[in-house]
Amino acid sequence: MTSPDSPDDIPEQFRIRQAKRERLLAEGREPYPVKVDRTHTLAELRQAYPDLEPDTKTGLKVGVAGRVIFARNSGKLCFATLQEGDGAQLQVMISFAEVGQESLDAWKADVDLGDIVFVHGEVISSRRGELSVLADSWQIVSKALRPLPVAHKELNEETRVRQRYVDLIVRPEARTIARQRIAVVRAVRSALERRGFLEVETPMLQTLAGGAAARPFVTHSNALDADLYLRIAPELFLKRCVVGGFDRVFELNRNFRNEGADSTHSPEFAMLETYQAYGTYDDSATVTRELIQEVADEAIGTRQVPLADGTEYDLDGEWQSLQMYPSLSEALGEEITPATPAEKLWQIADRLGVEIPRDRGYGHGKLVEELWEFTVGDTLWAPTFVRDFPVETTPLTRPHRSIEGVTEKWDLYVRKFELATGYSELIDPIIQRERFEAQARAAAAGDDEAMALDEDFLAALEYGMPPTTGTGMGIDRLLMALTGLSIRETVLFPIVRRHSN
């Protein structure tokens, strides 16, 4: 049985293992059979026999299968540890007395670490009290041509991300994170359904890119002879559902944005959007906090998130809120209002060294947000609702009911990153058209994140939409908030640059 000493040994390991595969085929022994008679999972046996006395025979014959992650071969008795997908492990014993010399020699010659094998035999406990299957026969189920990483060397992040399948095999934490994500998604759906929300599906391919300020991925439909866009948000279609009479709807699905990738951003990401008729952004902020806390309880088991530095992050209790313009004014030491000219904001940005592209037609609203992010956003550690945004950067949001020049929008910040956003939705079709036209002018001036004018959406609003609040929350970022991990660790298969080979 072979095991790699270093990554440099892999080509030789591959050659040796491939030769074993060819020999098995030549001998008429299938290294990749279509089926084996597995009767129990390893976890089931662990559960059925939690505390057998040492050197006990149960008389139960079983068939088990798993990946060989440890092996020790001696004269007439070989030991191996099998592992199955959920991480459960069990010892198997290959004995000369039970299988004979030919089968014992074949085990020693044919089986490598990483192979998946089937073992049939009796459930026993060894002399040391280890629950085991004493084989009376065995079979290779899948011959591994590549060796597993060396057990005592930790996988680096690049390998974990590029070869998540290896990460899942060797690292229990990777399997835990994958299961936590599934549990989080299930808990989100459950919490919304308890509140009467209906899950719907809306188009991934759209004829217009709308619903968010972001650069889209563009593709071409040969059948329609037209460009289509991978959606950047489902918002405009979900609002059509509200117009049609679905008072509480949500969608949990993929969005795509042709932008940067870093520790908090991914070009492809899972997004939750909700819309609730007859609610305001105050209502959706409350629902969002309750939702996150309920999901933490159900899927993670705690509202205190352990961080890499050994501290904890508390998601419990009420969360603070602040307003964008007053908090920016306080950080700068001078008053900034919706009437502050863009020229002054550019001067402040230059003075502070804030890098803002000058060729994208940014006006007052975008400059305020960039300055706020630089001076305030990067300091927000505790869960915080940031409220009341500039009009021109929130074209789908209702004007504030009492503050001139801002909209009823909040962003939720957790540990310095934006986790969710919520609006009191703009439902006046005339004002919405004016906002879209302003976005079109921004696009013409070079803003590649400006929204397109969607005539069909405007037509829907013209039929009448009830007062509505909407929210959006990235599931990947929710996992970050609940686990303390980076976005690439919370995504099972994140996008990575291809190797040249």
From Swiss-Prot:
<dbReference type="GO" id="GO:0000049">
    <property type="term" value="F:tRNA binding"/>
</dbReference>
<dbReference type="InterPro" id="IPR045864">
    <property type="entry name" value="aa-tRNA-synth_II/BPL/LPL"/>
</dbReference>
<dbReference type="InterPro" id="IPR002313">
    <property type="entry name" value="Lys-tRNA-ligase_II"/>
</dbReference>
<keyword id="KW-0460">Magnesium</keyword>
<comment type="similarity">
    <text>Belongs to the class-II aminoacyl-tRNA synthetase family.</text>
</comment>
<feature type="binding site">
    <location>
        <position position="418"/>
    </location>
    <ligand>
        <name>Mg(2+) 1</name>
    </ligand>
</feature>
<dbReference type="GO" id="GO:0006430">
    <property type="term" value="P:lysyl-tRNA aminoacylation"/>
</dbReference>
<dbReference type="InterPro" id="IPR018149">
    <property type="entry name" value="Lys-tRNA-synth_II_C"/>
</dbReference>
<dbReference type="InterPro" id="IPR004364">
    <property type="entry name" value="Aa-tRNA-synt_II"/>
</dbReference>
<dbReference type="InterPro" id="IPR004365">
    <property type="entry name" value="NA-bd_OB_tRNA"/>
</dbReference>
<dbReference type="InterPro" id="IPR044136">
    <property type="entry name" value="Lys-tRNA-ligase_II_N"/>
</dbReference>
<keyword id="KW-0030">Aminoacyl-tRNA synthetase</keyword>
<dbReference type="Pfam" id="PF01336">
    <property type="entry name" value="tRNA_anti-codon"/>
</dbReference>
<keyword id="KW-0436">Ligase</keyword>
<dbReference type="InterPro" id="IPR012340">
    <property type="entry name" value="NA-bd_OB-fold"/>
</dbReference>
<keyword id="KW-0067">ATP-binding</keyword>
<keyword id="KW-0479">Metal-binding</keyword>
<comment type="subunit">
    <text>Homodimer.</text>
</comment>
<protein>
    <recommendedName>
        <fullName>Lysine--tRNA ligase</fullName>
        <ecNumber>6.1.1.6</ecNumber>
    </recommendedName>
</protein>
<dbReference type="GO" id="GO:0005829">
    <property type="term" value="C:cytosol"/>
</dbReference>
<dbReference type="GO" id="GO:0004824">
    <property type="term" value="F:lysine-tRNA ligase activity"/>
</dbReference>
<dbReference type="Pfam" id="PF00152">
    <property type="entry name" value="tRNA-synt_2"/>
</dbReference>
<dbReference type="InterPro" id="IPR006195">
    <property type="entry name" value="aa-tRNA-synth_II"/>
</dbReference>
<keyword id="KW-0547">Nucleotide-binding</keyword>
<feature type="binding site">
    <location>
        <position position="418"/>
    </location>
    <ligand>
        <name>Mg(2+) 2</name>
    </ligand>
</feature>
<feature type="binding site">
    <location>
        <position position="411"/>
    </location>
    <ligand>
        <name>Mg(2+) 1</name>
    </ligand>
</feature>
<keyword id="KW-0648">Protein biosynthesis</keyword>
<dbReference type="GO" id="GO:0005524">
    <property type="term" value="F:ATP binding"/>
</dbReference>
<dbReference type="GO" id="GO:0000287">
    <property type="term" value="F:magnesium ion binding"/>
</dbReference>
<keyword id="KW-0963">Cytoplasm</keyword>
